[in-house]
């Protein structure tokens, strides 16, 4: 007998299928159903369909929420009990576990965890059937910096050798100036962090 999570996933899969109203733009990532008192809480994670980098906008999440709610109500999979629906996009801490995840992370700094227990920091350049292709980055890994000759060197990671990837938060990406961040409407948080760091540096100089 399928679990409730599996039953809800079965109901929602056609909603996000290719050719459906929202299936061309959105993909179903995860479904979980929990109980909170007398209510059930249905959490649905959706992402942009396809493998192109980019963020999911609020209008798309709202459209997904409407479609999911209608499908759940029509199916009766949750019975007569009231439920709360939460539809969201994956957070930056979502592990990269599929080729589509990795492809959508092109250009990002990622900590790649390998099957031999080691981890590497790579800038993802491209993704194909063979695996992930990137360049090594100079950040510390397990307390040891990579050798100078390896920094920026191409690194290919086969799918069989990859366990997961973890996207790293960057205050300023390579070649990106503060002026570039200002031009980006979504960069306000990054600018705030940069200002705070500058204030801390100024305070240290005053104390000296």
From Swiss-Prot:
Q: From start to end residue, where is composition biased (Acidic residues)? A: 177-208
The organism is: Kineococcus radiotolerans (strain ATCC BAA-149 / DSM 14245 / SRS30216)
What's the main place this protein lives?
cytoplasm
Q: Which SUPFAM superfamilies match?
A: YhbC-like, N-terminal domain (SSF75420)
The cellular component terms of Gene Ontology attached to this UniProt record, alphabetical and capped at eight, are:
cytosol
What family does the Swiss-Prot or TrEMBL record give for this protein? Answer: Belongs to the RimP family.
Record's function text: Required for maturation of 30S ribosomal subunits.
Q: Where is this region: Disordered?
A: 175-208
Swiss-Prot/TrEMBL keywords: Cytoplasm, Ribosome biogenesis
UniProt subcellular location: Cytoplasm
User: What GO biological process terms does the UniProt entry carry, in alphabetical order?
Assistant: ribosomal small subunit assembly; translation
Q: Which PANTHER family match?
A: RIBOSOME MATURATION FACTOR RIMP
Q: Tell me the Pfam families matching this sequence.
A: RimP_N (PF02576)
Keyword Cytoplasm assigned: yes
* Protein name (Swiss-Prot/TrEMBL): Ribosome maturation factor RimP
């Amino acid at each position: 007998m399928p679990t409730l999570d599996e039953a809800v996933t079965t109901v929602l899969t056609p909603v996000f299928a290719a050719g459906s109203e929202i299936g061309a733009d959105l993909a179903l990532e995860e479904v979980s159903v929990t109980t909170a008192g007398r209510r059930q809480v249905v959490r649905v994670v959706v992402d942009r369909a396809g493998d192109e980098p980019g963020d999911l906008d609020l209008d798309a999440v709202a459209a997904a929420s409407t479609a999911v709610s209608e499908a759940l109500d029509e199916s009766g999979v949750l019975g007569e009990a009231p439920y709360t629906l939460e539809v969201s996009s994956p957070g930056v801490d979502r592990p990269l576990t599929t080729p589509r995840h990795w492809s959508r992370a092109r250009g990002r700094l990622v900590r790649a965890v390998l099957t031999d227990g080691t981890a590497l920091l790579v800038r993802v350049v491209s993704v194909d059937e063979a695996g992930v292709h990137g360049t090594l980055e100079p950040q510390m890994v397990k307390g040891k910096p990579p050798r100078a000759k390896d920094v920026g060197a191409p690194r290919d990671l086969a799918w069989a050798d990859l366990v997961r990837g973890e996207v790293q938060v960057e205050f300023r990406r390579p070649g990106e100036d503060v002026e570039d961040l200002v031009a980006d409407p979504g960069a306000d948080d990054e600018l705030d962090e940069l200002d705070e760091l500058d204030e801390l540096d100024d305070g240290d100089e005053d104390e000296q």
